[in-house]
Amino acid sequence: EDDSDVIRQCLRAAVDGPFFSDSEFHTLFGFERTTLRRIAESWPVWDDPVEQSDAVSNSFNNLLGYPHGRWDVWHDYITPISSEVARVFARWRGETGLNPSGEGYFNRLR
């Protein structure tokens, strides 16, 4: 998979997967699930690049760093293993790696 496909998979997983409850979705993502679904369905095209960037960043960050406890179904939604997804996220952010600590998670929230 190329990076764009991994991003698409992560957006779809965040929206359609069992990783995030409706009650905490807006708090975690800064979007309603319906908005993130529209961004995911239109990937990579979206009329607001800042909104799209926030959606991608928060999808990656929450899938990798939030304690969703659903690693058992990760591969039902996302093909690469989490360490490869983290490398894609780092490249997308223009970084060489990600700080895996809780502080790193909170620093990456948008």
Task: Indicate where each model-derived feature is located.
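Positively charged, low-complexity terminal tracts
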Residues: 1-110
